[in-house]
């Protein structure tokens, strides 16, 4: 049984990902779309961390399912960090590139991890744990990226010869803070097939919960519509605010080269 997982990242002009220039400017909350930028510079910063984040999200679902008694993902070879096993040509590559080229919100996802909830030792508990595992992983990655920004900033300052490598890693980690918090909050949307729907259904009366889970393809349409309405910005605001809070605390460790990298990519 396969569960469709969709990951989202909306990139903004004054995004929380943006570094303060020369370590003096405060980080602003996102309010508008990312300006058109050279594709190569943007992909250098976005693609590695986005790919790793959505793969980690799916891996977490499969691993949590294994711990709850479902060995489906393990038997099919999906409990691996090999990106080739998780990449979906359409959702992971072509669709994000097409949306980026059209200056639209970027929708991307990894190949869904196969899961059979009927194998859970406790269906309800297992379903909730597996559904929240991906979200928890993205939050953990955001915190890990925060640590990477701090470490690379310290090393880059103390060892000038390493500042080039450190600035690239720091820029990707900086983007990763906001990106992973957005992925976590987006997947909490209570719209099937997103993770939040697997929690909300247990708060509804049984008859209503069954109809709610049968939304199917209409749920994807609802999500796509939300992406083009102000409602999604309100829903994602906790992610924006959290990213801004974390990044503001890191301003003193930002390398000048990092600021230049993000400026070139128009973050």
Residue ranges and their predicted role:
Residues 2-267:
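Hydrophobic transmembrane alpha-helices and their immediate loop junctions
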């Amino acid at each position: 049984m396969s569960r469709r997982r969709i990951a989202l990242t909306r990139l903004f002009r004054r995004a929380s990902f943006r570094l303060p220039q020369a370590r003096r400017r405060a980080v602003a909350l996102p309010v508008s779309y990312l300006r058109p930028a050279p594709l190569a510079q943007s992909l250098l910063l976005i693609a590695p961390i986005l790919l790793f984040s959505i793969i980690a999200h799916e891996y977490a679902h499969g691993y949590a399912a294994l711990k709850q008694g479902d060995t489906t993902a393990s038997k099919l070879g999906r409990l691996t960090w090999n990106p080739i096993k998780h990449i979906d040509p359409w959702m992971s590559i072509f669709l994000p590139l097409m949306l980026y080229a059209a200056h639209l919100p970027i929708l991307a996802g990894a190949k869904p991890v196969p899961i059979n909830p009927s194998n859970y030792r406790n269906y309800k508990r297992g379903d909730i744990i597996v559904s929240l595992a991906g979200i928890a992983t993205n939050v953990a990655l955001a915190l890990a990226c925060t640590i990477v920004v701090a470490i690379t900033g310290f090393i880059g300052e103390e060892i000038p010869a390493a500042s080039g490598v450190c600035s690239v890693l720091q820029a990707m980690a900086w983007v990763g803070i906001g990106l992973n918090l957005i992925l976590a909050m987006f997947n909490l949307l209570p719209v099937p097939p997103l993770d939040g729907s697997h929690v909300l259904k247990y708060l509804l009366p049984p008859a209503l919960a069954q109809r709610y889970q049968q939304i199917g393809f209409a749920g994807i349409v609802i999500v796509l519509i939300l992406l083009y309405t102000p409602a999604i910005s309100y829903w994602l605001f906790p992610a924006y605010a959290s990213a801004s809070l974390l990044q503001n605390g890191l301003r003193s460790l930002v390398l000048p080269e990092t600021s230049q990298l993000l400026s070139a990519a128009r973050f």
